[in-house]
């Protein structure tokens, strides 16, 4: 199970769905623009 768009996440343990990124600056699942 993965985290969907704009779900809160942990940068060091990225469980976002494919193509989403999780960064320390923006700790939620989103597209890497």
Curated annotation (Swiss-Prot):
Keyword GTP-binding assigned: no
Subcellular location(s) of the protein: Secreted
GO terms for MF: ion channel inhibitor activity; sodium channel regulator activity; toxin activity
Name of the protein this chain belongs to: Mu-theraphotoxin-Osp1b
Main location group: secreted
The keyword Disulfide bond appears for this protein: yes
The organism of origin for this protein: Orphnaecus sp. (strain Maanghit-Cave/Philippines) (Tarantula spider)
Expression (tissue specificity): Expressed by the venom gland.
Keywords recorded for this protein, A-Z: Disulfide bond, Ion channel impairing toxin, Knottin, Neurotoxin, Secreted, Toxin, Voltage-gated sodium channel impairing toxin
Stated family: Belongs to the neurotoxin 10 (Hwtx-1) family. 22 (Htx-4) subfamily.
Annotated GO CC locations: extracellular region
Entry domain remark: The presence of a 'disulfide through disulfide knot' structurally defines this protein as a knottin.
Disulfide partners: 2-17, 9-22, 16-29
InterPro entries: Huwentoxin-1
Protein function: Voltage-gated sodium channel Nav1.7/SCN9A inhibitor.
């Amino acid at each position: 199970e993965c985290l969907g768009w704009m779900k809160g996440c942990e940068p060091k343990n990225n469980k976002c769905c494919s193509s989403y990124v999780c960064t320390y600056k923006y700790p939620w699942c989103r597209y890497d623009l």
